[in-house]
Amino acid sequence: MMFDVTKYGAAADDSTDSTPGFQAAVDACAAAGGGVVDVPAGKYALDMLSLRSNVELHFEEGAEVRSLLKPVPQPGLKAKEPTANTRRWLIGGEKIANAAVTGKGRIDGRGFELFWPENDGLEHPLYGQRYWPQLHRPRGMICFRESRNIRVEDVLLLDPPCYTVWCLGCDDVRLENLIVRADLKGPNTDALDIDCCSNVHITGCDIECGDDCIAVKSDINDLGYDKPCESVHAEHCRLRCTSCGIRLGYEGDGAIRNCHFNDIVMDEVMIGISMMVAISPDDGRGTIIRHGPRITDCTFERLDIHALQGFNFQFLKNPEDCPDPITGCMDDIVFRDLRILSHRGSYLGGSPETKIGKLYFENVTMTLSGNMGRDFAEHVPYPYPVWNDLKWSGLPWAYYARHAESLTFRNCSVILDRAFGSWEREPIRTENVAECIADIGTTRI
């Protein structure tokens, strides 16, 4: 059955609050047993819309939703820094099944207008970021919590106030042929955040954003119970951002496993592939990480990466003198058939108390370019700086590895192309690595 939002009071005039009309159409569709809620061409002003089970929200070509969301405090949440409201969204749902957002329309979060102050001229933690958000942004512009059989397909997603799509505790999710356009200098405008979800397929997405493009996390504290993030598959995507093209870990204590990424192009990202195991009992934003995620059984194949840094793997404590041990891990991770153009060396770092497990690299070509200083030539700091390393020139080796059990490089190569200054011809430097098989050829052009 088809339910036209304009028949329920929605007005395509870009000013009238059409939330009641949209919600009435969604509720009527659900009450009838499900179907399609149709959004005809035109501009609609919308506040928070909650989808129901068995409802597809379909945008006809020329249809556009523009956000009316405002900062709303999340009850019981205290934070010292600007943070987000995890219980508000523009379009989403909680504990629903068989729901979808589809069509050739546009969804505009108006993050710049509604949630960001003027350019303050400072450089914030992310590469090139110039804006710092207000408190209480909706964390996910499109958000689904503890739901199953969810689809988001074909729509153009613009200017989110925080994450563009956030799925937490969901099963059977498909994100297909999405176009994401978020301000490259905006704060925390991740594109696709997959958090404690299983059986997720991401394909054909074209992304530009001001934080991570694809982030796989396991924030069981936010979810409220232990649930792994597993069986995540991303392919045939184009990524551009001011942080990480693909990020695994950081927020969360749950397992991240059986994740696969293939046939992806990254163009001008800060870090190509980031993996992070951290503990942070309270970082001031409400994020609680007690022991760190266990990241295992993941593969990266046939990726083209243009990045400031190709790989950055970290084990971190916040604060650095936190007495609790890191018990999370990275193990059984495979990188195969990768081509990387990078302007500083990659960091593969465990911690003295918790080493990286097995990393396997096969047929990985790392091209290094640009002028390299001597900031880290004599001494690489520990902990290695994460977001604030931009003031230094970086690592002069293609790979720097410390505190790891087993690293294997098969048929890999390093090409120094228009690489000046203090680049080292030695392709890898290791510290406290139990085993390193380094079949890495080096060529200078």
Where are these regions (language model features)?
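Extracellular/periplasmic carbohydrate-active domains that bind, remodel
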Residues: 1-445
